[in-house]
Amino acid sequence: MSKRTLASLTAADLEGKRVLVRVDFNVPLDGNGKITDDTRIRAALPTIRYLSESGAKVILVSHFGRPKGKPVESMRLTPVAERLSELLGRPVVKTTDAVGAGAEAQVAATSNGQVVLLENVRFHAEEEANDAEFAKALASLADIYVNDAFGAAHRAHAPTAGVTEYLSPCVAGYLLEKELQYLQAAIDNPQRPLAAIVGGSKVSSKIGVIETLLDKCDKLLIGGGMIFTFYKAQGLSVGGSLVEEDKLDLARSLMAKAQEKGVQLLLPVDVVVADKFAPDANAKTVAIDAIPDGWMGLDIGPESVKQFEGALADCRSVIWNGPMGVFEFDQFAVGTEAIARSLAGLTRKGATTIIGGGDSVAAVEKVGVASEMSHISTGGGASLELLEGKVLPGVAALDDAA
């Protein structure tokens, strides 16, 4: 990675310094305001601990939910501060606002090694607008900047890009460094064969990724609702399945590009169809050329799972982005869960397995094999953009490595 990292800063560089750390604590809450998944908080712990143990004053900044530029009581970061305190085993001070006199006073009262969590930065509309004055106000709280929020690195917002104009050094935290190393290496210098598994409901949201991967990978396995656009493009009847009619030509061109590049492009050979989009729908497995009228495909079938597992068996690197079916409904989660277990098995045999954010992460966690993957990305949109070969503004804004 060509960016300067936290590892380049010693305790002597950090002691007594105010360090602003952009983290991604946008975690899910249940109806009672309890955190249901603290993965993103845990992912930032190595950076927070290193700074704290080095005697820095650690000032964390995160967004949470979509409060649309004004304070919303249910989107305060109080539950996050409480969970972080538990994980660190020490109190975390939460400010009443992200900027302003109150935040300044609370930061000024901070002692070396203490951790402060600024209130939800999205209570200010200026945050997403990357407003210079707002970025300056945030930066005034600190001396050094660390970006450890891969999930927000694809946004040119004040806490990811704007503050870097006013602070020095600006470095990548341990989580951001790991994300970039794994994802960049998977694209630029993978162990081969490299397989990419792309799922999800729409081709349109994955066009850039599929096109880039066709230039990089040896095998491309496609699942999820987007398969029906490919089937229809081949003249097959897809019943009531989801199809993007305006993407049929695109699907044909992607299949042609795969052939031209010598990439093995695999589409499922059978699907699980349902008579309605519901967890209790009637369901049956059919070949892809036998989908009944009015029935919709909601998962890949057992023969497709075998086909995909066979294709993956000799792969040394696998990138997975997007589920194989509607895995929120248990009876249509079988394909996704089988692929998750298959990747865990490949990791045990020495392959590098990368789960590229979003629903695929939820899937491997649901199956209980998250810890068996080589790397789980914390960023959905950011990992997609990096896999597409785009420059992430939050990364570009950091200091270059010496």
Swiss-Prot record:
Q: Which SUPFAM superfamilies match?
A: Phosphoglycerate kinase (SSF53748)
Any one Pfam family here would be PGK
Localisation per UniProt entry:
Cytoplasm
The keyword ATP-binding is assigned to this record:
yes
Q: Which reaction does it catalyse?
A: (2R)-3-phosphoglycerate + ATP = (2R)-3-phospho-glyceroyl phosphate + ADP
Pathway annotation from the record: Carbohydrate degradation; glycolysis; pyruvate from D-glyceraldehyde 3-phosphate: step 2/5
Query: Could you tell me which CDD domains the record lists for this protein?
Result: Phosphoglycerate_kinase
So where does substrate get bound? Answer: 24-26, 40, 63-66, 122, 155
Q: Which UniProt keywords apply?
A: ATP-binding, Cytoplasm, Glycolysis, Kinase, Nucleotide-binding, Transferase
- Which GO biological process annotations does it have? gluconeogenesis; glycolytic process
**GO molecular function terms noted in the UniProt entry:** ADP binding; ATP binding; phosphoglycerate kinase activity
One cellular-component annotation, GO: cytosol
Enzyme category, top tier: transferase
- The UniProt entry lists the main location of this chain as cytoplasm
Q: Which residues bind ATP?
A: 206, 297, 328, 357-360
**What is the annotated quaternary arrangement, including any partners?**
Monomer.
What family does this belong to? Belongs to the phosphoglycerate kinase family.
Give the matching HAMAP family.
Answer: Phosphoglyc_kinase
Q: What name goes with this protein?
A: Phosphoglycerate kinase
| Source species | Synechococcus sp. (strain ATCC 27144 / PCC 6301 / SAUG 1402/1) (Anacystis nidulans)
